[in-house]
Swiss-Prot record:
Species this protein is from: Serratia proteamaculans (strain 568)
Membrane-crossing segments per the record: none
InterPro entries: Nucleoid_associated_NdpA
Coiled coil feature spans: none
Short name of one Pfam family: NA37
Keyword line: Cytoplasm
Family of this protein: Belongs to the YejK family.
Keyword Oxidoreductase annotated: no
Protein name: Nucleoid-associated protein Spro_3255
Annotated GO MF terms: double-stranded DNA binding; single-stranded RNA binding
Subcellular location: Cytoplasm, Nucleoid
Length: 336
């Protein structure tokens, strides 16, 4: 992994009791060695693979001002991290989920992009076997389950200050509270809505097919082309590029997809991250509720699966063998 560490600061928040969250500040930056590099690579990999929300700094953000000063005037990164940890403690202490942890400020470069990653990492206990085959307790940072993490794309922030996506953060296992906490700490607002962008793309695809008066098979072929491209981008960690996507879709009318979507006012960005759950709707129907969970290929609607809108009834012709086997065994058991 081509990841170059510039500087890392570690501090700690310690929960003394239900009302007290103390700060333990390190007096020097963390030296970069093999163990530190491995930790940052793992943190970068785990964070990059998770679903993130996008944001931007509010005008007058204290953290943004401090970071800007730190970078423009070449101020002490350690001092910046120490002051920011104090603000982090003040915000985190407002929430009942505050448990403390190791606070990491990592400035690094990856593929010519400069980042600042801020994370609160929990420590966990585990067991290990030593050379004498004795069991010892060891402590480790639980990076895989980290959910209090934010990352600033410093390159994007400084070269394109009008961007709505240079700041990202995780939603977290406790939902909106973690999002609120990071918004308060960073003094930021939510920016690019990736789900809305993906939903807009799906609507544009459906309207594009309808405008060209395509039949069912032709529509599904276009949806499959869109899904294949978007899924490839998702797997590669790349964003959906509308211009590239338009080239992947075989022309079906007088206008190509890019021209059509631009003229119809879907307000799609030139590029945006793919959302796996939303894109799945291109090829599948899925839903759950009331004790029922179901998903099926979109091509089956109208062939083996029929929906009566008036009665809200789905009729399935030909059940999957494993489901049919369970139903038969339950029926036979009931008849004995």
């Amino acid at each position: 992994m081509s990841l170059d560490i510039d500087q890392i600061a570690l501090h700690q928040l310690v929960k003394r009791d239900e009302q007290t969250l103390d700060v333990v500040l390190r007096d020097s930056l963390l030296p970069t060695n093999a163990a530190v590099e491995e930790m940052m690579e793992e943190l970068h990999r785990v964070y990059s693979a998770k679903s993130k929300a996008y944001g931007l700094f509010n005008e007058g953000s204290e953290l943004a001002d401090a970071l800007r000063t730190c970078r423009k005037e070449d101020k002490d990164f350690l001092a910046f991290s120490r002051a920011a940890t104090g603000r982090l403690r003040d915000e985190l202490a407002k929430y009942p989920f505050a448990e403390g942890g190791v606070v990491l400020f990592g400035q690094y470069r990856y593929l010519a992009v400069e980042y600042l990653l801020i994370a609160v990492l929990n420590s966990r206990n585990s067991s290990r076997v030593n050379e004498e085959l004795d069991i010892n307790t060891t402590h480790y940072l639980d990076i895989n389950h980290a959910d209090i993490v934010a990352r600033i794309d410093l390159t994007e922030w400084e070269t394109n200050p009008e961007s709505t996506r240079y700041l990202t953060f995780l939603k977290g296992r406790v939902g909106r509270k973690v999002s609120d906490f990071f918004m308060d700490f960073l003094a930021a607002a939510e920016g690019l809505d990736t789900k809305a962008q993906n939903r807009g793309l799906l609507q544009a695809v459906d309207d594009y097919c309808a405008d060209a008066q395509l039949d069912k098979n032709e529509r599904q072929s276009v949806r499959q082309q869109v899904y294949s491209y978007c899924n490839e981008q998702l797997q590669a960690g790349e964003e959906i590029e509308l211009q590239e996507l338009s080239k992947e879709i075989a022309p079906v009318g007088e206008k190509d997809f890019l021209q059509f979507s631009s003229e119809q006012g879907y307000q799609l960005e030139d590029s945006f991250p793919a959302d796996r759950g939303t894109l799945r709707q291109l090829t599948k129907f899925a839903g759950s509720g009331g004790g029922i969970s179901m998903n099926f290929d979109a091509m089956l609607l109208g062939e083996r699966i029929f929906w009566d809108a008036a009665t809200d009834t789905l009729t399935i012709r030909g059940t999957p063998p494993n489901l049919r086997d369970q139903l038969q065994r339950r029926q036979n058991s009931g008849n004995k």
